[in-house]
From Swiss-Prot:
Annotated catalysed reactions: phosphoenolpyruvate + UDP-N-acetyl-alpha-D-glucosamine = UDP-N-acetyl-3-O-(1-carboxyvinyl)-alpha-D-glucosamine + phosphate
One Pfam entry name: EPSP_synthase
Binding residues for phosphoenolpyruvate: 23-24
Lineage of origin: Bacteria, Bacillati, Bacillota, Bacilli, Bacillales
Function noted in UniProt: Cell wall formation. Adds enolpyruvyl to UDP-N-acetylglucosamine.
Any single Gene Ontology cellular-component annotation: cytoplasm
Family statement drawn from the similarity comment of this UniProt entry: Belongs to the EPSP synthase family. MurA subfamily.
EC numbers on record: 2.5.1.7
Entry-annotated residues carrying 2-(S-cysteinyl)pyruvic acid O-phosphothioketal: 117
UniProt-annotated catalytic positions: 117 (proton donor)
Organism encoding this protein: Listeria monocytogenes serovar 1/2a (strain ATCC BAA-679 / EGD-e)
GO molecular function: UDP-N-acetylglucosamine 1-carboxyvinyltransferase activity
This protein's name: UDP-N-acetylglucosamine 1-carboxyvinyltransferase 2
Gene transcribed to yield this protein: murA2
UniProt pathway annotation: Cell wall biogenesis; peptidoglycan biosynthesis
Amino acid sequence: MTDRLIIQGGKKLSGTLQVDGAKNSAVALIPAAILAESEVVLEGLPDISDVYTLYDILEELGGSVRYDNKTAIIDPTDMLSMPLPSGNVKKLRASYYLMGAMLGRFKKAVIGLPGGCYLGPRPIDQHIKGFEALGAKVTNEQGAIYLRADELKGARIYLDVVSVGATINIMLAAVRAKGKTVIENAAKEPEIIDVATLLTNMGAIIKGAGTDTIRITGVDHLHGCHHTIIPDRIEAGTFMVLAAASGKGIRIENVIPTHLEGIIAKLTEMGVPMDIEEDSIFIGEVENIKKVDIKTYAYPGFPTDLQQPLTALLTRAEGSSVITDTIYPSRFKHIAELERMGGKFKLEGRSAVISGPAKLQGSKVTATDLRAGAALVIAGLLAEGRTEIHGVEHIERGYSKIIEKLSAIGADITRSSTAETNI
């Protein structure tokens, strides 16, 4: 069986969209709970498949997970360092955070190579470099990564590439190491601050999270705590783009505007009216979208995760817009699908040129990854007629209750299951 989203497009939407907790925080906060020696309570977690996969993995390790609505109570007391060869680990890329957490607590881990969205070469060499600097021996045996350490000792680690995953993973491994660790050229994303806040509440000593130099003084023990996750800035940004594309007045609630400066700046440049409050943003109706050029950069630059959704909106803009992805140059698989709907594009190296305005028509399309899926949903809402999106599972990895949320603001969107057919 294959599930599809069916969208009848061309409707103007209005109302309120509620942003959930940050996916990219959740997938690190849940493994971080392994480091504690008593119960950890996480509040505001998103209702997405990656989160449930991590609960299953923690239970495989002997932990207890109770969850209700958006709160998880994780008791890691009886956990053991069991090998995690594949299965659940293969379902999500962020399973690599289990390496840092298990290494930090047990001094050893065996983990199958992680899965998730395929976005071209994205190896974990910086993670491994960090673990080795802390004293771990890392080997790759039969498609699994083996980590072993007699003891972990603080070290000075310079990241050759600014990597959110490596920054968080090294933090997880270093908080219970002996002595001081310094991570230089660290990533500065809000999700890193969120993980550092959780670890600090557990008793870790961390200075400089959110800057390019993070200093950690190792401690022997970490205890449980309560922690509320930050809102998902990528979901918020996606909703802002969707509101600009198809809205006639949409309020987006549970946001931190300072986390959204890149997308706010670009939408303003495109002529999108906005009213920004402390924890909500109102997007007014837009008649004409102005063309823009965008380059993705590491935070606080324009996020690569929003370039695909924005591509769909730019089909409405007058003239030629250029999007350059400096982070993932091959992240343009959605372009071919948008072309099926009548979008006009030209790919040049790591850039896409979007010629507009184009009148999109409903079509059968396939989401190849999470944010491509978001782009196709926005395009489907913009398009005249019926759009059928395959690859729903990609979308649901990162957007919780997307059908319910969009239906509530007037979208005609449903889910349909059919037997496998090739399109």
